[in-house]
């Protein structure tokens, strides 16, 4: 890895940042992180306004950035430094002018945030750099010394695209926010459609990539979807209408069809939303309403994910551009399994453009595979979820396995989504699906009922838990009643969706198999907890919704405090797990975050109070502190607020608030709906495996690294710190230095780096 001196005897290293191509929510978070991380590391950031057009124009379009220039932009959509198409940059003369203007400012390092077109143009510019310098020296536009000082152009690309169409990265900046817009719209359309028993055709973006239509179809519970990677077969009109009719017969009151703006049939002929509506009317005589979502998908406030992940990418981009792994290769920093990953820029661009060629060649399986494993899995899941039971390949029989679903522990948004997915996917396997009302107490009271395909209609959109959930862990005295209920209802397996108390309940129950043999059945634990404190799961169902709820509340707290000089101390849930606190701190722009994991001392609080006062003396108007609800037995929210108030001496006031149960409420986020669906699909696969092998084992599953892992419950304490009720391994703690770097201005210093993984292949 080449080591670059951040400062020279005369001036600091200068880093340019620009946004190019279509705007995407989260670009501002990335720009903010680049600017502030560069300053924290002693480099000088420059904003190149309006993308490459600003570089071609030069002068005032290349602006030196200060810490305050990046203030107040984290929660804004679009890009505050602008983006524009630049035909001039496509020509050599335009790139030549851009090179001159960058050299005039002393910039030879660029963080470029854009799509594949912007990034490929950037790579062409990089390969020409030496030629531009030579010609500029010959023209007398720059000196030989300037050319020698900037012999090489360093490039790091960040992918900004709401379509999520870059091969090699799980997510692109803006995709999660766009999915939020679409799913919100589907939820709202579904309610009016159900009222009138109507059919809606919803057109979403995704000219060449089916991520948005496919994921919104799964998360929104759509009946039919058209994606570029899986073009419609001949006779699609009749198949679609049959699917919708059978769905209505099975209990649906509304029909939702999702179509990508780039959808085609297998001959490459475009299929528009109007084509679909016309085909529906020809075969049913009924009108289908058309809603084209358009640019609402691109605008508005970024989601929590697009804030914290874009901040992470911006931080890592500065780290990479100052110490490039290979200075001769332009790289993209993408995301794989929530880890920053280094990807060769041009190879990623070629692979991305190659998907279009695969579609044209009719190799649709390869086109889907290029989108990643999660995409191909979700294609199959969507087919199963949307297929009415009368069209299912495995209708339930008298000898069908009876699988019961139970919720336990604290409420987590997405529990209903998990139950819906379990019922419909289980029925597709030919099983009889049962619901247990009222958690373990309900099972003991024999509150067990069969759940049919239409019983769970609409559950995907709802917060709460239709089956109910309770926190108490059953005692040994209740085991007999639980065992009798399992036997009486002929339950062959249990799907337990819940939090840590659910895990502990299963652990304790299965330790008594000799005395209570009824518990000797396959049991799969599915993680659902806003605390994100469960073993063997990097993210639990409900965590993303809680994070978005918290960030929404913190945004409003900041607005309320902005009218006067104020410090606000906000308390978040999580018990002794600081995930919500740290991630909401990064996503909301908090200055301080206090976590149970860090054992804050009184001396540190005293130092923080002095620094807080100094910032207000320097002109600050707002200061946000986030604290975990169990950060410390003594140094809690009220204590911190009192200390900061005592230090203020009237310079500013201090308010505190516990965000409370709003973090548990509301409809589950798109991510939580998709996570719940994927985990349930994997859980049913585990049950299928146990049934076929004659095994009866209690296990817990979760997304870890690049796969959903299955682990035995009897080894659970290998992963779990029971004293603090959280996992030993908490991946998100590696992000702690980022909050420090981008939230509080200080003297340039060494920053603890984040780990940047190297992509070994494009299979992810």
Question: Where do the PLM segments sit?
Answer:
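Short, ordered loop/turn segments at secondary-structure junctions
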Residues: 20-23, 48-54, 85-86, 115-118, ...
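N-terminal phosphate-binding or glycine-rich loops at protein starts, especially the Walker A/P-loop
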Residues: 2-59, 397-444
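C-terminal non-catalytic interaction/assembly regions of soluble proteins
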Residues: 272-397, 641-764
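Short glycine/serine/threonine-rich phosphate/pyrophosphate-binding segments
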Residues: 24-34, 55-56, 91-96, 116-124, ...
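Short glycine-rich or small-residue beta-strand-to-loop segments that form or flank ligand, phosphate
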Residues: 14-22, 79-84, 108-114, 157, ...
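Glycine-rich oxoanion-binding loops at beta->alpha junctions
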Residues: 2-8, 56-110, 119, 145, ...
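Accessory alpha-helical/coil subdomains and C-terminal extensions
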Residues: 45, 112-114, 120-154, 172-290, ...
